[in-house]
């Protein structure tokens, strides 16, 4: 079965040749550009012949645009929280909506477009 046929059959509760397979991996400090993130995800899928890609940008991408400061240490170490924009209760009132098509989210969206 092709990857797509296997997934569609499984979702339709039909017999498959095997259970669809995927998993994710984070590539610390290698995944901050859209093209590199796409390359890493596609390479892992091809190497392991997975049925689908579970996109895995670095774990804190979703909070950076809200004002979280990261400590990016480099090497195999993942970025960690350096400073939160929330230091006192009133700080919650300063949080403004962020766009889902800009900033860190845009990096992830662009990587998915490239990988497609």
Please state what every model-predicted region is.
Residues 1-116:
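Catalytic cores of TIM-barrel enzymes
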């Amino acid at each position: 079965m092709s990857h797509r046929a296997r997934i569609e059959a499984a979702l339709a509760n039909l017999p498959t040749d095997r259970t669809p397979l995927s998993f994710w991996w984070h590539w610390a400090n290698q995944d901050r550009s859209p093209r590199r993130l796409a390359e890493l995800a596609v390479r892992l899928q091809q190497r392991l012949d997975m049925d689908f890609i579970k996109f895995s940008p670095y774990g804190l991408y979703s909070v950076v645009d809200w004002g979280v400061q990261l400590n990016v240490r480099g090497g195999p170490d993942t970025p960690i929280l350096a400073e939160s924009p929330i230091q006192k209760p009133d700080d919650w009132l300063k949080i403004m909506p962020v766009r889902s098509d800009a900033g860190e989210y845009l990096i992830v969206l662009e990587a998915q477009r490239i990988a497609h």
